[in-house]
């Protein structure tokens, strides 16, 4: 049992170096990905654990959201190759063991990150509450799921949060193996460790929806989907000042959380002082700390308007898209029902 931010990464100097470390499985990944969908957590644990003693040492808080009957609606796996991120900021969220491996490589952190050759995932089968939509994902479409056609940055995380809202009792099964992810474009320019900062983006919507209202308890998924859509519709109808105020609060919370993580990384530097990449990593952390503190101290009074200006958009366009998204979510069950009638010819 664990959370998405507990995934580990191993970085390689090149795609060739990575391939030399590959262990090719002799089973069909599609069949393996689908085998647990629709099963209960109890059934999955019986199939994957040698006995109750296998749970020894697990943090009980990780199991609190689940019960023996918790269904598996989604399964996913690790990534082998490009991590799929727009920059190298993802390494900031890795556990200390991964950071240590990164800094211990004589190539240097940025050169290693620029190779875009990594394994990212769990070391074995892992149960968690949230999904991130991996390169190969299993979906149990026999039950109502939120729309799952992510095209933009952050929409995979938005799907995971919406799935949790619809089925708070469900569990996500993470396989311990990975599938290749080799983009067609050259992404070697994405190795730079730029200071961590937070601005208004799609993730603000995901963060807002993550906080489920207390009156959702015991409500069926169909009604929960409508409640989700109504939340988004209400956001699209807010006055500009009210919307800016909400986003300001979300940004402050997110920046404070990232600053705390940055300070934890800085505190851990004493254990990394003899590694080749420690100085570079320390500079990155100090710049990130200063950037986050600066954003917290000089809070932008109009984060939404500024984000829209950078994106060459405006508030009315955002409102219209929000309303259209809400209406599309409400229509999603009908779309799924119509899809059942499709036939391949």
Residue spans for each PLM region:
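Active-site rim elements
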Residues: 147-150
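Acidic donor-binding loop at a coil-to-helix junction in glycosyltransferase catalytic cores
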Residues: 153-158
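Terminal low-complexity segments of carbohydrate-biosynthetic enzymes
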Residues: 56-59, 63-135, 142-144, 166-345
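C-terminal structured domains
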Residues: 161-164
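Conserved donor-nucleotide/metal-binding helix-loop-beta segment in metal-dependent transferases, i.e.
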Residues: 2-81
